[in-house]
Amino acid sequence: MPTSADQPGVQLDQQNVAVEAPPDAAQRIEQLRADRMFSSDLSVGEFLLAREAGFEPLGVVVGSSVYHIGWQPQYMTVGSQYGYGFGYGYTYDDQELTVLTEAKLRARELAMSRMEAEANALGADGVIGVRLDVGEYEWGPGLAEFIAIGTAVRARGAAAGSYRTKFGKPFTSDLSGQDFRTLLHAGYRPLSLVLGVCVFAAYQNGWTFQQMSGWWGYGGVNQEVTQFTQATYSARELAMGRMQTEAANLGASGVVGMRYEMDTRLSKSDAEFRDEINETNAGAPANHWRSFVADLFAVGTAIAPLGADHEIPKPSLVLPLDG
């Protein structure tokens, strides 16, 4: 994942994250430490299972970043197009929108780094139950708020401090309290949340244009739109590959709980925007070239063995006596 130094005093680096918690967060954390109480977004069952696994919750930790996403240049090719007839001119290449990919990745890094900074201030060994949310503002085009939130935990007794990553950071995981306990009992420990992001655009070519144009001809039959299928494949593979690379860089043996979220949209063309603004279309349907955008986010928890000699307990059958 890329590194960043977007703000004074903020340095993002996968091996040495140095981000100070904001003053209000520092005050809240100091109060938690002084009162010797904890806060948690774990359920009652998750809380009890985390304690049974040897960890004490310390407090809810939060990181956020309101990020402006910049302008994306688009690359074109001179060539021929088949549509209704044959034409020659400029066409957009199917391509990753790297400016958008990088912006969404850096914003999530900032949010997670600030969450880790709060956990570090609490003396935590890690953060469990992490959620990553994104909110957009109607009043701010191009603005998005990226939020990371979870419960900081610390191992009890002699194990305290031993679950931090090899870089001295608290581990992060989106596993629930139940899954966290099961993972530890199976002889593995979480290392870090690993992310992969890709925003990919496919610009409607002549064949795709025919497939999607009206009820006559090719537009009136069931068929796969292969250009858009390929775009979703490309976005998925790029995002998952980046997530796997990040896990490998941490020395992980694998990734568990992996999930991906994909948002797809079909944009309006420049001509359609001009028609809406100038009202030159008079309600007539517009047959303009459009772009298909696949926005994909992959996330999971990288894990490593606790030790080579650990044996997984055999499952046992328990029969309730209360009927």
Q: Which functions belong to the PLM regions below?
A:
Residues I69-W71, E136-Y137, T264-L266:
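Short active-site-adjacent helix-start/loop capping segments
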Residues R131-L132, E136, G140, T151, ...:
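A solvent-exposed interaction/effector surface
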